[in-house]
Amino acid sequence: MEREVRVLSLHFTPYTMEGALTRAQALIEAGGCARVYTPNAEIALRAARTPAFSDMLARAELLLPDGVGVSLAARLYGEQLPRLTGIDFAEALLARAPRRYRVYLLGGKAGVAVRAGRALAGRYPRAEIVGARHGYFPREEERRVYDEITAARPDLLFVCLGSPRQEEWIERLRPPCLSIGLGGALDVWAGDKARAPRALRQAGGEWLFRLLQDPSRIVRAGALPAFALRVLLDRWHNHAKCRGSV
C-alpha cells in the first residue's frame, strides 16, 4: 500500500512528477472514467469545512498538491509532500506522452479554449485537440455538453471551470476518460494571463504574482491565513490527543 500524507481532511500520495505522470499514463491506457484533482490551500480549507466536498476529492484516482501552502502544511505534520501544480503536470503529461493523446478543453470565456487549444497543439506535437468549448453554460445544458465531449472520444479532458464547480461537474457527469481539474490554466495557455517567473514560482510566490495581476483575488487570498490557522489547530489537537493517550 502506498504511503499517504494527510493535510487536514485530504490524503495525498507523495508522488514525484515522474511518479504522477506514470500513474496518469496508466489511467489513460486503462480507459474509462478517472479523475485528477489539484487542491491548493483554498480548496483544502473548503474540503475541511465541507465533508461532502472532501469525500468527492477523496474519490479521485490522483490527488496532487497544487499550492505551496499544502506542501508547507505537510511539513508541520512532519511529512514531505512535493508540490505538483496542475498546469505543470498537464503540460508535462502532453510533453512526455508515449503516443498521440486526444485532448478536449472545457472552460473559460468564449474563444479562450479555442485559442488555448491552438497554443497547446503548436507546443506539443502529440496533443491532438479534438474539441474546445467555453465554460459558460447552464446546468440544464450539462448533458448536451457531455454528449459533445464523449462524441469526440478524448483521452484527456481538461476541465477549467474553477473549484468547486469543476470537481462537481466531473463527479456528476463522469466522462469516460482522464479528467483533470485545472482552474484557470486555459487563460494562461491562451495568453490572456501570465504565469509568475520561474524563480518566483520555485520560491512559492506564485500566489502573490496572481494577486498583483488580479487584485480582486484579495477576497480569496483570505483563505491562506484561515488555512494556516486550521492546520495549526489540527496539529495541536492531534498532539494533545496523543499526549492524552499516553
Residue ranges and their predicted role:
Residues 51-59, 167-188:
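A short, gly/pro- and small-residue-rich
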Residues 1-88:
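N-terminal nucleotide/polyanion-binding subdomain common to many enzyme families
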Residues 40-43, 161-166, 185-186:
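Short glycine-rich anion-binding loops that position phosphate/pyrophosphate groups of nucleotides
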Residues 71-148, 152:
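Conserved beta-alpha
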Residues 71-72, 195-246:
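A transmembrane-helix-recognition feature enriched in membrane-embedded lipid enzymes
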Residues 36-38, 64, 104, 156-160, ...:
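Structural motif
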Residues 134-138, 177-213:
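Short, flexible loop segments at boundaries between secondary-structure elements
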Residues 149-163:
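Proline-aspartate-enriched helix->loop->beta-strand connector
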